[in-house]
Amino acid sequence: VAEEGVTTHLKNWLGREFGTEYAKTLLPVMQEHYRLAYIRKPEFMGNTREEERDPIYKKVKDLPWSEHTIRERLKDYAALSSVVEEVEVKLPAYRKDAYMQLVKYPVQAADQMNRKLLNAQLARHGKTDWEQSDTAFDSIASLTRRYNALQNGKWIHMMDFQPRKLPVFKRVAHETAVTPM
């Protein structure tokens, strides 16, 4: 990797796994996925800190982001998810399980985790309805069931949509914010 660089390595890997024609499309998708995760990992979107003793840190709460920032991030993830779907339809059948494991699940689970928590933040402030957050939670569970069923259950229990039953991975409680965004 050091010799060729991360971008070339990723492009070559995508080409090897899914074909060079798809690598060109998937490279920017994966780069943007990693960029968004670098800003805030999906598991940190609930603004919780499990290691802390004080229970206040275990409660899902707002991020210090503006409504504009939240909506832009949701839009960015929606665009990635859309491309992931478009590529999956075109892939040959023998590549689809690997694609689900290596591209679709990571990108779309991150998308849905962001949707779940960011739409919950907007809903707490009356800027959207709770259904969007709840639907995202259900989508994460569905994606995870599909992942675990790959290859006749080869990877069963490999992924858990609620690891360690942490609050950030649960359905977000429908609450109203008392302070403005």
Protein language model regions, located:
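Substrate-binding groove of N-acetylhexosamine-processing glycoside hydrolases
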Residues: 1-181
